[in-house]
Regions:
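Short, non-transmembrane alpha-helical segments in secretory-pathway proteins
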Residues: 32-52, 95-116
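Amphipathic N-proximal alpha-helical interface segments
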Residues: 65-90, 132-150
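Bacterial N-terminal signal peptides that target proteins for export
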Residues: 7-18
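C-terminal motif of bacterial Sec signal peptides marking the signal peptidase cleavage site
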Residues: 28-29
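Extracytoplasmic electrostatic interaction patches
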Residues: 96-150
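A cross-family detector of function-defining hotspots
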Residues: 53-71, 116-132
């Protein structure tokens, strides 16, 4: 009698586990579908080991509506409605060097050899970076230094 109860209990738990796994897979697929194809390509190119865990639509920014995408490694990427990246924030390991314009990388290596770029933003004047030492620096569209921001 107790064997039948245990078997029934195990079947219920297996069903619940399978349903939970399916729900998680479906939620992940839904999250990926919320991102424009151009944004998804960007994420796949620069963050191939990461997956999307959250997509939010923001419209309280002065720059207009945008998507905020959070990756499972803590990276946050913000895109405009066309799927163009606006900001990349990656506190733990820094922004991928392949994403940063070469003159900006060289400037940081020369002037801040111990620091990494934790945030890269596209701005009307060019680029703004935030460093691991909490300094902010502005660059023109060609990646040439403009100024440090206090």
């Amino acid at each position: 009698m107790s064997w039948n109860n245990n078997e029934s209990y195990m079947r219920k738990n297996i069903r619940k586990t399978v349903l939970l796994c399916l729900a998680i897979l479906l939620m992940t697929a839904c999250v990926d579908n919320q991102v424009p194809p151009q944004s998804k390509e960007f994420i796949d190119k620069y963050f191939p080991q990461s997956s999307i865990v959250l997509v939010e639509m923001d419209d309280d920014d002065n720059d207009g509506k945008e998507y905020s995408v959070l990756l499972n490694d803590g990276t946050k990427v913000e895109f405009d409605l066309q799927g163009e990246w606006k900001r990349v924030s990656r506190k733990k390991t820094g922004v991928p060097s392949t994403l940063v314009p070469k003159p900006i990388l060289q400037y940081v290596k020369t002037n801040y050899p111990e620091d990494v770029i934790t945030k890269l933003s596209r701005k009307p004047y060019g680029f703004k970076i935030e460093l691991s030492n909490d300094e902010d620096v502005r660059f023109n569209p060609q990646g040439q230094f403009i100024e440090k921001i206090d």
